[in-house]
Each structure stands twice: as structure tokens, then as C-alpha cells.
Amino acid sequence: MIIRHLSENIINQIAAGEVIERPANVVKELVENAIDAGATRIEIVTANGGKSFIKVSDNGCGIPADQLTLAISRHCTSKITDDVHNIYFLGFRGEALPSIGSVAKLKLTSRTQEAENATEIIVTAGKIIGPKPAAANPGTIVEVRDLFFVTPARLKFMKTDRAETNAISDMIKRIAIAFPHIRFSLSGLDRTSMELPATANSTQGQLQRITQIMGKEFAPNSIALNAKRESIRLTGFACLPSFNRSNSLHQFAYVNRRPVRDKFLWGTIRGAYADVMARDRYPVSILFIDLPPADVDVNVHPTKADVRFRDPGLIRGLIVGAIHEALHQIGVRPASTCSEAMLSAFQTSQPLGTFKSTHQTFSSQHHHLASAAASPLHKPLDATNFVNLREEAVPLMECLDMPSGDICTANTTPSSEELHYPLGAARAQIHKNYIIAQTQDSLIIVDQHAAHERLVYEALKDALYSKPLPSQLLLIPEIVELSEEDATCLLTHKDALQKFGLGIESFGPGAIVVRETPSMLGEVNVQALIKDLADEAAEYDTTNNLKAMIDCVAATMACHGSIRSGRLLRAEEMNALLRQIEATPHTGTCNHGRPTYIELKLADIERLFGRK
């Protein structure tokens, strides 16, 4: 077999296979080039999901006429010279334009601010035409037609036009969040599908841009983040635990303003919410990590979607600590989406006559009450009507026996001071599980079991971690065989593991002996536990799996040791529970991620009854 030197066009096509997977990748590369050029206005036009036509226009610095040929040549760039460790631009490899030109019909038109005329160059399947003079405003216009016409087999892997357009839209949104000062627009050949006006390049402008993309419900359900460790700064927004989604599509992470989809960051964010969100739910979050370029490697993935941090443990600690601190500081603040869902459940237009009795002991003498209530009033009611109605209604109410709807009311009128509490004063308990509380301007519904479960769980954790956890000695120490590297890495966490009741020691190269395990875990599969911890230590330089297992046991204990549904509470007990909820962190959700209380504003109640 003869070794041959591949042609430049074949090399570009191979590179395109890595960099250009779908039309959204083309848009990403071209938009990033526009941002690097200092553009403040970027317009994207597509047709057929970008498969037949893509046009990206910007008002950036433009490309000098004598450098257009270099711009479409492989590994020609103005963004780096001889240092690949300090990268300050989104693009730096010089692969995008030649890769696109090798698999599509590419037209590049550019003009600098100083030039009188624009210049264009055309590349079709690697063949170059031009450059030649053209007419255009200062900036750059890139047109891409018939993507993958050179490699039609790739078109078979494309999704529908709608799916590809949605992927392009999602890509633009992810980039636009990091650059609020840039105006973005996305349109088809006949209509504009997305318009993002420029905002101030500040925290407020950032939130305004995020609201444009995420919707109005994001701001009231988010918490601002601002933390720093050493030379690394974390800013952005984290959501309330009860404001979550069923997938990770609403998690946005940026490293030096570069959008990334990094599994390490996703796992870290979910880990920060582990105690307050259900396992099958994902937080809505937008994180910006700014650090020296030398501390992160962005050149580890063809599309630069993944990154590698020099100190991942520091990054993990910063993110988890910042989110925990933010959640601790919010106090009593339910997600507005819970209240909106509650409001939408009300059926205010349902006629009274459509309600059916669930009780079978109604006597026939009371049936006329329902029909009278549902029929129109033909004459005004006088005082006698009201008296008669009340006399008939009393025995009717006495005959209703509905245990599931038992109501225990507080006989005392709440003071103005009690109404000033975040969760107000308890007014009643319904269905032997829900506490109804009143504040100055709202009504609060509390799930007593879920709320007390969180209180017990937090108290258990405080008691557990205030001192080293008790351990149980193994009758026969167990030896676990690992690779020498994994064993060495895990032993560096020996002291931390000892605090959780796990005693390990070296037992020669590539082996660890386990002499004691946490008492809380009871019988444990030592082999599986040590191997899982070794994998985690090798990949993330942490051993959080053990803490997660202990937390899981504590959560189970809290669930079984809390106030059960069906228990009647006195007014004093209900108010004491409300005050404990206010004083304890993370009480917005139970251990399983469900809301513990819901707030319904007085203004919303008045709207339900048509008062506002």
C-alpha cells in the first residue's frame, strides 16, 4: 500500500467532516468570525434549513482585498501567531472558510472601512474564482449555497428543514446571550423569525437579552451569581429549584464568552441542585466563567464545544459554592410558575349546574337547592328569601360527611405583625395535609409533609457533618484491586473520606484495603463503592459520590421521620412550622424536588373574580 500526500481540497473536505456536521455549524463558524471582527450588527438569512442557502452579513472591520485569498486558505488566520495557549478569540484555527468552500458554493464579499470598494471571491468545491471588485457596505458578507453538494451522502443524515432551522435558531440564541451589545436577526427568504435588538453591555443589559430569549418568566425565577476564586470569576443566573425543565437544553455555559456544551460543567450544575431538585429534572441556568486563557484548553474538540480546565476541582467548587450561597440567600421565594400553574387550574366559567355531587346521602328534599342555584334569578331576593335559604342550607351542610375535605381553622385573628412574616399566619388546615396561610398581599398553601421533610433533612445534615461520621469496622478488611494511577489518585482523598466514615489505606501498588465503612450505609458493596470513587477522583478530582450516598440515606430518614399527611395540626403548630420554614435554607422544595409551598397573590385572586 503506497502512502500518498493528499491534495489540499481532500484535506479541506476531511476537515469539513469534523467541523461542519450540519448547517448550524456553518452559521456558528461564520457568526463567530463576525464577532471576532468587531461587528455590532449580524444578520443571518437561510433557506431550506440552511441546506440550500445561508447568508451571514456583518458590519465588522472587513478583510483587506489583498488578503481575501489567504482568508479561504487552510490554517491562515489573523487571530494567533505562535501561542496556542493564550487565545482571546472565538475562532483561531483558520479552518472554517476553506472547509465550507470544499463542500459547498462559497461567496465571500468584504470591504474595510477605509476601502472605496468591496472585493469578492468565489469558491466552488475547492475551485477559486477571483478576487474581483464588488459593491457592498463596509463589513463582510458570506453566502453559502448547496451545502454538501460535493458529498451528497451527507445530505441523507440531515434532518427536516424545520429541525435544521430550529438548530440554527438555538445556535444563534446561545451565542447572542453572551454578546448583548450585538444586534442579531435570523430570517428566511420571505420572513424574519428572530430579531434581537442590541442592549447595554452590562448586567442589566445581559438580563434584558436573556429575557428576550428565555421569556419573561426567567427574571422573576432566577438568582444573580457573582463569585470569584483566585483568578477565576463566575457570573450569571441560576434558577429557583422549582423552576426547572425535563432536559438540559436550557442550561447555558460560557467560558470566556465562548458557548460550550461540556459534560463536566453540566454535571457540576446538576450536582449543585442535587439536594433541592428531582433527579429527572434539570435546572435552568446561565453561567459565565472568565479565567486566564492559559488556564483552559479550548482546542480539544473539532467544534470547540468541549473544553479542558487546568484545575477542574477549583471550577467545580466555585460553581457549587456560588449556587449554594445564592439558594441560601433567597430565603422564602416560590417560583412564579407554580402560582401560574395554580391559576390556570381554576375554571371560572364553569356553570354551577355542571358540578355533580359525590355524596350519595342527599335527601330528595334538598335537590331543589342545586337547581335553584343554577337557574337565573327572575326577581330580587328579599330578607325572607335569605332566611329561608339559610334554614334549608344548614341541615344540608350537616349531612355532608367528606373526611378528605376536613378543615381545621385557627380561631384567632392574626395580628398585623404575623401578616408581615414571609409565609404569614396560619388560617386553616385542609385535607389534613395543606396549611392555608395569609400574608398582607397573598395566600400561601403549604404541604406540611413536604415542608417538614425538608426541615428534618437539613437538621440531619447539620448534625451529621458537624463532626466526623461514625464508622463500622469490617470484620475482615476488604482489598480492592485498581490501576496504580487510580489507587494513587484515590489515596490523595484519604482524609476527606475518613470524615465520612470510610477508612482506606494503600495495600501495595494498585491495591487499596478498606478497613471501615460509614455506619449509616449499613451493608455496602465495598468493591463497587471504591471503584466508583476512584473513577470520580480520576476524572473530576473529587469524591462526592460517597457524600451523595449518605445524603440519600439522610433523605430517606427525613421522609419517614417527618409529619405525615393526615395529621391534624393546631394553629400554634402550623405557625411554628411556618417560622421554621422561613429560618431554614432550601425549604422551597422537599428532598424529592417538589414544591413545599405555593403563593397566590391577592391581585391574582381578584383577577379570578373579575375585580381587576
From Swiss-Prot:
NCBIfam families: mutl (TIGR00585), PRK00095.2-4 (NF000953)
Family that this chain belongs to: Belongs to the DNA mismatch repair MutL/HexB family.
Key words, A-Z: DNA damage, DNA repair
Pfam families per UniProt: DNA_mis_repair (PF01119), HATPase_c_3 (PF13589), MutL_C (PF08676)
Annotated InterPro entries: DNA_mismatch_repair_CS, DNA_mismatch_repair_MutL, DNA_mismatch_S5_2-like, HATPase_C_sf, MutL/Mlh/PMS, MutL/Mlh/Pms-like, MutL_C, MutL_C_dimsub
Domain of life: Bacteria
Record-given protein name: DNA mismatch repair protein MutL
Signal peptide coordinates: none
Function summary: This protein is involved in the repair of mismatches in DNA. It is required for dam-dependent methyl-directed DNA mismatch repair. May act as a 'molecular matchmaker', a protein that promotes the formation of a stable complex between two or more DNA-binding proteins in an ATP-dependent manner without itself being part of a final effector complex.
GO CC, alphabetical: mismatch repair complex
GO molecular function annotations of the record: ATP binding; ATP hydrolysis activity; ATP-dependent DNA damage sensor activity; mismatched DNA binding
Organism: Bartonella quintana (strain Toulouse)
Any one of the GO BP annotations: mismatch repair
PROSITE patterns: DNA_MISMATCH_REPAIR_1
